[in-house]
């Protein structure tokens, strides 16, 4: 039990790993579609760090596209007197933003809807995007306001998911690398013109299907996502020289990333033997099997989803009457988050899953709250044992098992290292979920068979206590690696 890493073989040669997950768009609230990338990526980051690697996580924001021009033009329509829209203004731009987060969240959908029916407005938005991307100072000042207001809100909402990033970079950061990238691809004879666009072939011998060439510049001269993603890789190579890349993105993006990775290696941006892993995840669906929606049929905001779950958990723990009143709200948040994350992470990432809140928050079965309940049970036994034995509560070695349930629990605990290693090498957090559930079940069977606190043989009781203390350590570590925690009471 003294082993700091619980029997894990940490990496002999620590790697520098870039994990790209999150992928939120600036100026838009996080919705349920953002859940999986954040939750899966956070877990892979924690597992990789636990293995001893140097990990850099990057949210890679969408902060440079047409949405910026749409917001600028909608703001122009609403507040035409702002100095940003006065061509004769030469002073400093205000440090206070011209909108709050709730106003900003109203501006974007209004602009997006308007652009679908008003061609002239859309044209203005495209012009504004072009001016911003060409370095026009007034629009750059608005862009900075959009970034500051939006980032504060994004950080809060990711924080509520217990998700954090080392880098808050976006597509805008990659822009300076694009001209050099295009020039290099042309110089090496990799990029050629096709219908006015600039493309790079990515087909390889032995491909089971045909892959279309990767377009790096449109016929109108505009850069695309592929260009921006390649430029980001150049930036990452210069800043970090990564040994491994992991992208946690919707599986529908697979072709895009095959193209980007192949161009990166073909052009020598990334060494041929550097693993570039695309972890494509499936969708979270409603009970009807279709994409998860609000009652009105719209896309549900992530903060509303979390709030709904927390409220349901609050009612549940209120009924049980085991949690002190001042801990109720925080406990509901901790249990609600574990319900949500475990429901997601316990599925293989590539598979779709059905969102069923009543099943997810159950204290029985294969759920996050069930595992938390087992941890809380162990905490309670350990506290009572301390009261019972006082100064005699010494740590003793775990003894050879005397029963099948004791042996099964010991065997389960021994597997922590190999399971964690396998979760890392296969980028498969669901393996850790399965393991954690197996340990919780093994503990429960042991607990039901042995009266730990009323055991009369003091040496035997002390060995039981050592065993469940180790069980708690293993479960707590798994919870942390998956981005969850357990409450004090339930």
Question: Which functions belong to the PLM regions below?
Answer:
Residues 1-5:
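Short, basic phosphate-binding NTP loop
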Residues 6, 11-490:
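Non-catalytic interaction-recognition regions
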């Amino acid at each position: 039990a003294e082993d700091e890493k619980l029997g894990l073989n940490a990496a002999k040669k620590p790697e520098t790993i870039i994990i790209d997950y999150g992928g939120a768009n600036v100026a838009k609230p996080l919705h349920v579609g953002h859940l999986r990338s954040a939750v899966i990526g956070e877990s892979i980051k924690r597992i990789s760090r636990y293995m001893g690697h140097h990990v850099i996580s990057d949210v890679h924001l969408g902060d440079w596209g047409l949405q910026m021009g749409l917001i600028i033009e909608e703001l122009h329509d609403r507040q035409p007197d702002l100095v940003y829209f006065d061509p004769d203004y030469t002073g400093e731009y205000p440090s206070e933003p011209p909108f709050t987060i709730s106003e900003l969240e109203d501006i974007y959908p209004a602009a997006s809807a308007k652009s679908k029916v008003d061609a002239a407005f859309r044209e203005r938005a495209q012009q504004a995007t072009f001016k911003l991307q060409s370095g026009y100072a007034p629009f750059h000042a608005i862009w900075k306001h959009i970034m500051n207001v939006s980032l504060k809100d994004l950080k809060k909402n990711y924080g509520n998911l217990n998700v954090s990033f080392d880098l808050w970079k976006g597509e805008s950061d990659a822009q300076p690398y694009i001209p050099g990238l295009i020039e290099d691809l042309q110089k090496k004879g990799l990029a050629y013109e096709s219908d006015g666009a600039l493309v790079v072939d990515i087909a390889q011998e032995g491909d089971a299907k045909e892959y279309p060439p990767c377009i790096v510049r449109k016929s109108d001269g505009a850069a695309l996502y592929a260009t921006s993603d390649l430029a980001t890789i150049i930036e990452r190579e210069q800043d970090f020289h990564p040994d491994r890349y992991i992208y946690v993105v919707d599986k529908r993006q697979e072709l895009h990333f095959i193209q980007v990775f192949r161009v990166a290696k073909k052009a020598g941006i990334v060494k041929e033997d550097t693993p570039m892993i695309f972890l494509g995840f499936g969708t979270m669906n409603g009970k009807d099997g279709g994409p998860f929606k609000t009652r009105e049929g719209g896309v549900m905001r992530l903060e509303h989803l979390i709030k709904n779950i927390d409220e349901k958990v609050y009612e549940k723990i209120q009924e049980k009457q085991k949690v002190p009143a001042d801990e109720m709200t925080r406990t509901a948040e901790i249990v609600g988050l574990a319900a949500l994350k475990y429901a997601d992470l316990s599925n293989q990432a590539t598979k779709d899953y059905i969102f069923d809140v009543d099943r997810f928050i159950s204290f029985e079965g294969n759920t996050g709250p069930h595992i938390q309940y087992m941890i809380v049970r162990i905490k309670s036994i350990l506290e009572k044992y301390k009261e019972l034995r006082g100064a005699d509560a010494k740590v003793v070695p775990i003894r050879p098992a005397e029963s099948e349930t004791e042996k099964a629990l010991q065997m389960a605990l021994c597997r922590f290292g190999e399971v964690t290693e396998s979760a890392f090498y296969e980028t498969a957090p669901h393996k850790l979920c399965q393991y954690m559930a197996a340990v919780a079940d093994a503990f429960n069977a042991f607990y039901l068979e042995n009266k730990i606190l009323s055991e009369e043989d003091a040496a035997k009781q002390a060995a039981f206590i050592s065993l469940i203390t180790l069980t708690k350590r293993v479960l707590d570590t798994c919870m942390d690696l998956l981005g969850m925690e357990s409450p004090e009471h339930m």
